Amino acid sequence: MSGVERGVGQAPAAEFTQSADLVLLDVDVYRRSLHLIDCLTLAVGPGRILGVSGASGAGKTTLLRIMAGITHDYAGSVIRPEGRTAFVFQEPRLLPWLSARKNVGLTLAPDTAGKLFIAEEWLERVGLADAMDLYPAQMSGGMRQRVAIARAMATDPALLLVDEPFSALDKPLARALRDDLRAIVAQSDLVTVWVSHDPGELDAISSTRLHLDGPPGGWRID
């Protein structure tokens, strides 16, 4: 999904031109009468990583869903980059009856030229060249998360949304996967928004930091 999207009753963000940027203009978010985000305005360009922090319930995942166009329960305007949006979640969310290769290929359209080649290429890039035919139950947690990264990047996204991807892994493995994903993002001209509770992780990957204070909607950009 791309272009300008508006929350209920808002004027268009006419002053922004459609481009490769992710733009939020005066985004206001309530949940069950709680004011989570108050008039957030920001822009993230290609090749940049916006790191998002905040306490549980502050609205981090809700903000990702707004950026993705999954939820429309907000006021304000969102301009998304032209192209696909991809996710990397805390849980890999792989289909247990499919191999690594087929889990990655599943995100590609049936008529995608070289579908299996694309899946294999990305599995190689995340270090799983020898594990393409393994099923999720045969993989470690780190391997499953690498498949999830390959699956997201195989779609050639313009916008990558990353939600606590390594919080369930031990610190050395989490650090290695973080560095791998950061390197992949650096080689791709895409906009990335990365949510984490780990300040060290966000320090390592962020071009810009957004902290959500939660109710009554405060936030700050570093």
At which residue positions do the language-model features occur?
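Helix-to-loop junction immediately C-terminal to a conserved catalytic motif
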Residues: A68
